[in-house]
Amino acid sequence: TSEYIEIEDNSEMLAAIDVEETINLEKAYRFYVTADVPNQEKINFILTCSDKIGTYQTAFSIDAFAPEFALNEITILPNNIVKPGETATLKLTFDNVGNSVAYNVLTELFVASSDVEFENTTIRTDEVAAGETFFVTTDFSVSSSAALSSVYEVIYSVCSKYNVLHSNYDL
């Protein structure tokens, strides 16, 4: 068993199987993969068949695939410099390095200082294919009363149903 699998239907009854006969059971078992499964997680199963005479067991595994986000680049447009009283654009570039498409990707930004104000703190991307690069942008302003050469920690989170990336960046 795996912490990433929830088995809903785990048994199937058959009337009889003749010697040398092969039986295919379509939609015989039902299980769900949890949302937090890591990309390329190997999930092991044990199949047990039994009758009045004895028991047969075999094992098999499947690989679960999930999106996986990685930060590629952070850019402040137009020139990577923002002075007090100015407005600029923050561009974050991410890669989906996982093996599955990510749906309804949500990027959230947070800064604790009142000197920095983002136009959008939540940015939605509908779909990001496996291996695809995507970016989010938002304008932000730095208060005119902010001290010159101040550094502000920006916390960002990128999440979809099956993956979350949390980190921070000094602005």
Where are the predicted features?
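Intrinsically disordered, low-complexity Pro/Gly/Ser/Thr-rich segments with frequent PxxP/GP/PP motifs
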Residues: E6-V37, V116-A146
